[in-house]
């Protein structure tokens, strides 16, 4: 075996070594997603959520657009999944502005039932962004019933890539979360 290796031309050995190192290096550049979901199937069926409002996600990052960006992607992907009817973001902001309520209430001054009545929804999606860069992007979203106040499902997702723009990482990470949620809730 060693004698066979010695017969390989030096240039081919170098090329094989380079190819091996390249494959090894690039294998760490692929997207890695980790999803954690939890839900209460009996309660979810009992509540029969049809229409939801997705609020701006909270973010403690210097980039103040992180919460807005991820919540909009989550809203879009949730709508495309067909799981729920989604109230238009502009309508949410208009109704809340008319009542003097901030658009991203960490602890809303209105009760969930009041929010449900005002927005004509069965559930509200709240969320937070914990990491926001192309290497590590993480968020959590949860659906809360406006009738019972119970969290009906929760999804936490992380993802990241070395050689991709943040917008692509965010899009892939959110899509993966909604897909996983959709699969588990079937």
Q: Across the structure, where does each feature detected by a protein language model lie?
A:
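C-terminal/domain-edge helix-coil "capping" segments
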Residues: 29-53, 71, 77, 113-119, ...
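N-terminal segment of the mature soluble domain
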Residues: 49-56, 61-110, 117
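Conserved acidic residues
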Residues: 122
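Conserved Rossmann-like nucleotide-binding pocket used by diverse enzymes
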Residues: 25, 53, 125
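Short, flexible beta-strand-to-coil junctions
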Residues: 59-63, 128-133
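N-terminal post-signal-peptidase region of extra-cytosolic proteins
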Residues: 39, 106-114, 126
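Bacterial N-terminal signal peptides that target proteins for export
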Residues: 2-16
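Bacterial N-terminal signal peptides
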Residues: 17-27
């Amino acid at each position: 075996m060693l004698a066979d290796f010695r017969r390989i031309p030096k240039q081919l050995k170098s090329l094989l070594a380079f190819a091996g190192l390249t494959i090894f290096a690039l294998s760490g550049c692929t997207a890695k997603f980790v999803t954690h979901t939890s839900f209460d199937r009996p309660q979810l069926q009992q509540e029969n959520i049809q229409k939801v409002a997705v609020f701006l996600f909270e973010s403690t990052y210097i980039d103040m657009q992180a919460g807005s960006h991820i919540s909009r992607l989550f809203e879009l992907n949730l709508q495309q999944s067909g799981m729920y009817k989604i109230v238009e973001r502009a309508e949410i902001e208009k109704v809340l502005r008319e009542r003097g309520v901030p658009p991203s209430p960490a602890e809303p001054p209105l009760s969930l039932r009041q929010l449900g009545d005002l927005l004509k929804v069965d559930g509200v999606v709240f969320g937070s962004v914990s990491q926001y860069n192309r290497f590590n992007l993480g968020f959590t979203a949860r659906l809360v019933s406006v009738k019972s106040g119970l969290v009906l499902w929760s999804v936490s997702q992380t993802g990241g890539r070395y050689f991709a723009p943040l917008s692509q990482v965010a899009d892939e990470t959110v899509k993966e979360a909604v897909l996983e949620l959709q699969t588990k809730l079937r």
